[in-house]
């Protein structure tokens, strides 16, 4: 596959394209949690995830399926938010924390609780220590989407303890936190908590709704060193993709454009082709240059219930058709 240069003159390399496709598939299988089809302490191709999913059992499609172990499954209880799973791909030397998109009634309810509330991290002790040591500044005036902040109320410490245990055994492994739509918003918040606890994850989200006010957007970009990663990428003419906060957005998908009074953080990659398949030449690296507007996301003649709008083709078509616990 040739290296494709974007309008920003930064290339979408075969490595980056492969990573994007791999992690949207890893994100998508989180939908199988609803049917209790992800099993702990098993590899993907040995019952860890459903055999009807090619990504789980076909080593041509996923060569490291037999080396990827499901370590923890987060199944949100009634009234809670945040189903997902933690897995380790020993072939790629990566720890994956993936969150499920909107599935339950509570998920839908949280999607629409859009009024802003004051941000407060889960890891308050670690947060205060970083401020006292001068490593980060306090997130003054920071507000975010109420529905998604509910996640910090239900995200248990089990995830962090398990991750610490894994990285003690495999200190050279990288962390990737990922999700689609609601799962992308939760991945963003989990990534912030991991940074506060001293980890250095790559947060890679797909179809992320806007969740931060302007003050928090700036603070999140500082936390993830967005400016430094952007500058280094331009200097080296190569996207630095081992850590930081990256958002993948699809043309015609209006979810990343709402709510209009919030702001996106991180570095953007834009899929400019509507239909599948989408290849490297269909991806534009935009970085911090967010050019999306709300009107760009709506098609003429679009009608129906809001829940129908959230499942339009453009919102699902991110290298694969992201819809339920499907074949991938």
Swiss-Prot record:
Active site as annotated: 181, 253, 315
Class of enzymatic activity (EC top level): hydrolase
Catalytic activity annotation: a triacylglycerol + H2O = a diacylglycerol + a fatty acid + H(+)
A GO term, aspect molecular function: triacylglycerol lipase activity
EC number(s) given by UniProt: 3.1.1.3
Gene Ontology biological-process entries: lipid catabolic process
Keywords, comma-separated and alphabetical: Hydrolase, Lipid degradation, Lipid metabolism
CDD domains assigned to the protein according to its UniProt record, in alphabetical order: Lipase_3
Family of the protein in this entry: Belongs to the AB hydrolase superfamily. Lipase family.
PANTHER family: LIPASE LIH1-RELATED (PTHR46640:SF3), TRIACYLGLYCEROL LIPASE, PUTATIVE (AFU_ORTHOLOGUE AFUA_6G06510)-RELATED (PTHR46640)
Function statement: Lipases catalyze the hydrolysis of the ester bond of tri-, di- and monoglycerides of long-chain fatty acids into fatty acids and glycerol.
Name of the featured protein: Putative lipase LIH1
């Amino acid at each position: 596959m040739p290296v494709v240069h974007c309008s920003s003159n930064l290339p979408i390399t075969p490595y980056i394209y492969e990573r994007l496709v791999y992690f949207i598939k890893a994100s998508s299988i989180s939908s199988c949690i609803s049917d209790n089809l992800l099993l702990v302490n098993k590899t993907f191709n040995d019952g860890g995830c459903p055999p009807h999913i090619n990504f789980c059992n076909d080593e041509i499609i996923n060569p490291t399926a037999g080396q990827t172990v499901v370590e923890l499954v987060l199944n949100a209880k009634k009234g809670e938010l945040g189903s997902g799973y933690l897995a380790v791909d020993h072939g790629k030397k990566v720890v994956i924390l993936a969150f499920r998109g909107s599935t339950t009634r509570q998920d839908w309810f949280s999607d629409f609780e859009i009024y802003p509330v004051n941000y407060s991290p889960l890891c308050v002790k670690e947060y205060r220590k970083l401020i006292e040591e001068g490593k980060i500044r306090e997130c003054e005036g920071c507000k975010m989407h109420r529905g998604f902040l509910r996640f910090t109320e239900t995200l248990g410490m089990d995830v962090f303890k398990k991750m610490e245990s894994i990285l003690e055994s495999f200190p050279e492994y990288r962390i990737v936190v990922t999700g689609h739509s609601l799962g992308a918003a939760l991945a963003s918040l989990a990534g912030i908590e991991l940074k506060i606890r001293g980890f250095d994850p790559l947060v890679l989200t797909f179809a992320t709704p806007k969740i931060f006010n302007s003050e928090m957007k700036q603070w999140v970009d500082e936390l993830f060193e967005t400016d430094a990663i952007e500058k280094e990428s331009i200097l080296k003419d190569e996207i630095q993709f081992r850590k930081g906060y990256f958002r993948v957005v699809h043309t015609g998908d209006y979810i990343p454009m709402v709510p209009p009074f919030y702001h996106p953080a991180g570095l953007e990659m834009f899929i400019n082709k509507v239909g599948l398949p989408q290849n490297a030449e269909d991806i534009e690296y935009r970085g911090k240059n967010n050019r999306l507007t709300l009107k760009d996301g709506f098609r003429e003649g679009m009608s129906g219930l809001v829940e129908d709008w959230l499942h339009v083709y453009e919102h699902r078509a991110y290298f694969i058709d992201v819809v339920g616990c499907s074949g991938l």
